[in-house]
């Protein structure tokens, strides 16, 4: 995913935290903030030290999240800035569980623009 698709600055992160709405499941929390006049969505990913004590574990989970979001890119609403925050429960997730849990929370947060992903899971 290109840098233009990322929420990069601390200021942008804080704006989404403070003004956005949150939705969560056991593995992830998603904060969303609608942004009009935006060509494409922007996402920020946060995996703290409570999730994985080593950088290897945290980076692995971030890779899984980015891969899932890249796969879902056509279905993600373009008018959003959103943050994906991993919870400690997600520590031992493999790619399949990461994808399943992330799709679930993105649906709850209404980040996905259609329901085509439902058929993919089954």
From Swiss-Prot:
Keyword set, alphabetical order: Endonuclease, Hydrolase, Nuclease, RNA-binding, tRNA processing
A single GO molecular function term of this UniProt record: tRNA binding
Function recorded in the entry: RNaseP catalyzes the removal of the 5'-leader sequence from pre-tRNA to produce the mature 5'-terminus. It can also cleave other RNA substrates such as 4.5S RNA. The protein component plays an auxiliary but essential role in vivo by binding to the 5'-leader sequence and broadening the substrate specificity of the ribozyme.
UniProt similarity note: Belongs to the RnpA family.
SUPFAM superfamilies: Ribosomal protein S5 domain 2-like
Subunit structure: Consists of a catalytic RNA component (M1 or rnpB) and a protein subunit.
EC identifiers of the protein: 3.1.26.5
Any one GO CC term of the record: ribonuclease P complex
Reactions performed catalytically: Endonucleolytic cleavage of RNA, removing 5'-extranucleotides from tRNA precursor
Protein name per UniProt: Ribonuclease P protein component
GO biological process, one term: tRNA 5'-leader removal
